[in-house]
Curated annotation (Swiss-Prot):
EC number: 2.7.7.87
Name this polypeptide is given: Threonylcarbamoyl-AMP synthase
Enzyme class: transferase
Species per Swiss-Prot/TrEMBL record: Hahella chejuensis (strain KCTC 2396)
Chief location bin: cytoplasm
Swiss-Prot/TrEMBL GO biological process terms: regulation of translational fidelity; tRNA threonylcarbamoyladenosine modification
Listed GO CC annotations: cytoplasm
The protein's role, per its UniProt record: Required for the formation of a threonylcarbamoyl group on adenosine at position 37 (t(6)A37) in tRNAs that read codons beginning with adenine. Catalyzes the conversion of L-threonine, HCO(3)(-)/CO(2) and ATP to give threonylcarbamoyl-AMP (TC-AMP) as the acyladenylate intermediate, with the release of diphosphate.
Record-stated family: Belongs to the SUA5 family. TsaC subfamily.
Catalysis: reaction(s): L-threonine + hydrogencarbonate + ATP = L-threonylcarbamoyladenylate + diphosphate + H2O
InterPro entries (alphabetical): DHBP_synth_RibB-like_a/b_dom, Sua5-like_dom, TC-AMP_synthase, TC-AMP_synthase_SUA5
UniProt keyword list: ATP-binding, Cytoplasm, Nucleotide-binding, Nucleotidyltransferase, Transferase, tRNA processing
Length: 184
């Protein structure tokens, strides 16, 4: 991936914009999770109820250290054994990010990805980004850049070109406290 594309995406994120980008299985919408206006824009674009919350993704485990360091060692070990990879973990939220990210929950969903583009992007950005499937409510998630543009047109500030990793379904979601699978 050209450094120019990554820098353009970082610029969009830094100024509170919304980005579309490829992930492991589907195209995603993302933004700076500390920018409430950007998080709200994503919810509006998707027509997604705020109560559901959103996932944060990064390519660097250290971006989640302030969340992981609060966990018992056994929970932390269980999480780290699945990363990087397509497993999202729900952990207690200390209120670090925009409240809309956690929705009506007292926890936040986080994932460390192995997708090379997202790894490069979050490293350059210096933190995690919001990651939610690129689709309006009730529609199938976009699996191509064309589908993503068709859904959102100019509602997205930047479309980061790239390829999906080839997984057939979005990430599994698990509860860190219980280990329960919340989404298969």
């Amino acid at each position: 991936m050209s450094a120019w594309f990554i820098q353009k995406a970082v610029s969009v994120l830094s100024r509170g914009g919304v980005l579309a980008y490829p992930t492991e299985a589907v195209w995603g919408l993302g933004c700076d999770p500390s920018c409430e206006d950007a998080v709200n824009r994503i919810l509006q674009l998707k027509r997604r109820p705020w109560r559901k919350g959103l996932i944060l993704v990064s390519g660097q485990i250290e971006h989640f250290s302030q969340l992981l360091d609060r966990l018992p060692q056994q929970q932390k070990d269980q999480i780290l054994a699945t990363w990087p990879g397509p497993v999202t973990w729900v952990v207690p939220d200390p209120g670090v990010y925009a409240p809309l990210v956690r929705g009506a929950h007292d926890a936040i969903a986080i994932r460390v990805t192995a997708h090379p583009l997202v790894v490069e992007l979050t490293k350059a950005f210096g933190g995690p980004i919001v990651s939610t499937s690129a689709n309006p409510a009730t529609r199938e998630p976009a699996r191509t850049l064309f589908d993503c543009r068709r859904y959102f047109k100019s509602g997205v500030d930047h479309y980061l070109p790239g390829k999906l990793s080839g997984l057939s379904k979005p990430s599994q979601i698990r509860d860190a406290a219980t280990g329960a699978i919340l989404r298969q």
